[in-house]
Amino acid sequence: SDVIRYPDSVEEKVVLEKIEELNKDISVSGILVQLPLPKHIDKQKVIEAIDPSKDVDGFHPMNVGNLSSGYESSVPCTPLGCYLLIKKIEPNLSGKKAVVVGRSNLNGKPMTQLLLKENCTVTITHSRTKDLKAECLEADIIVAAVGIPELVKGDWVKKDTIVIDVGINKTDKGIVGDVDFDEVSKNAKALTPVPG
């Protein structure tokens, strides 16, 4: 794989021209644009310039639509990795109650679509959800991807819950996730560490 680096001062036109060149290059099978972009570059315009079949992140509107419609599409790597890990722990997800804490286009929404595809009952929550603890206590699966250090506490998680922590937060203690690992590990069937 090749990495193409530009200074923050790069013109949007230069980035779009490079994407078009890569789209046409049959030796290139995937394109990933590292976000966030400099403020003067229109993120949506850049994402939409990528050929959907080469969109590694799955951010192109066609891929987002295909995923939410249940069609074949590129899936962002973090939700896909979380999904595969959950399936390894619990192969039959049908009928399971899942709570996704976070509604981002990068993690929360794609994760929701993947779990729905497995016939889970999914509740999408976020930092402003009223009584988030009560929502989590109902869950067989919790995916925390909200960007709040150690938000999910031990008394939010019932026994034998699968807990996937996507959060990466810098704190005085160092890097921590969105889940209080020490507390939640007492109840969880499986729990991902951060960092890990």
Name every feature range the model reports, one short phrase each.
Residues 30-33, 144, 164-165:
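Redox-cofactor binding/interface segments in oxidoreductases and associated redox assembly factors
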Residues 8, 76-162, 174-182:
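Glycine-rich phosphate/diphosphate-binding loop of Rossmann-like nucleotide-binding domains
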Residues 29, 140, 189:
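Conserved acidic residues
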Residues 1-32:
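N-terminal ligand-binding/catalytic initiation module
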Residues 43-60, 64, 159, 164-196:
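Rossmann-fold NAD(P)-binding glycine/threonine-rich loop
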